[in-house]
Regions:
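Short, solvent-exposed cationic patches
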Residues: 121-136
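C-terminal cap of metal-dependent C-N hydrolases
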Residues: 64-121
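His/Asp/Glu-enriched, well-ordered alpha-helical/loop segment
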Residues: 1-74, 90-91
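Generic recognition of well-ordered alpha-helical segments
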Residues: 16-19, 45, 95, 101-102, ...
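Generic structural signal for well-ordered, non-membrane alpha-helical segments
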Residues: 10, 35, 39, 113, ...
């Protein structure tokens, strides 16, 4: 899963995982808050919070088949050789290169596959405005 705008305006699970890692280091020292800890919290931890262990948050037989792939090439990753997970969290991809949700390709080569994105965003804006008008 990914964070929603109710808790983080960016809707970026990567940013939330990175923030968790950095805050753990700030609170408990540089050795605390490893990249693997943050990845575990973001994947299996999120599944546990939702009561969906074994279904989401991992790649295993019987899981729904969600996966995101990031490219770790380019200038941002120039010195990040030893630990790709640490590099991923510290150097920060802007968006996934490929994303598969429930076994279906959603992002290919950094582009959304659906040709309905503009329609979905238009509908989202209308619904968001309706919701926000009730808050006011």
């Amino acid at each position: 899963g990914v964070d929603g705008s109710s808790s983080a305006d960016s809707a970026s699970l990567w940013l939330e995982a990175r923030q968790a890692m950095l805050l753990a280091k700030l609170q408990n020292g540089a050795a605390a808050g490893t990249a693997r800890m943050a990845l575990e919290i973001a994947t299996r931890g999120g599944a546990g919070c939702l009561g969906r262990i074994g279904e989401i948050g991992e790649i295993s037989v019987g899981a729904v088949g969600d996966i995101a792939v990031w490219s770790l090439t380019g200038p941002a990753f120039a010195g990040a050789i030893a630990d790709p997970i640490e590099a991923w969290l510290r150097c920060g991809p802007v968006s996934a290169k490929h994303t598969i949700v429930n076994g279906k390709s959603v992002v290919e080569n950094g582009q959304l596959v659906s040709n309905k994105v503009d329609d979905m965003l238009r509908q989202h804006r209308v619904l968001a405005q309706q919701m926000q008008s009730h808050l006011g």
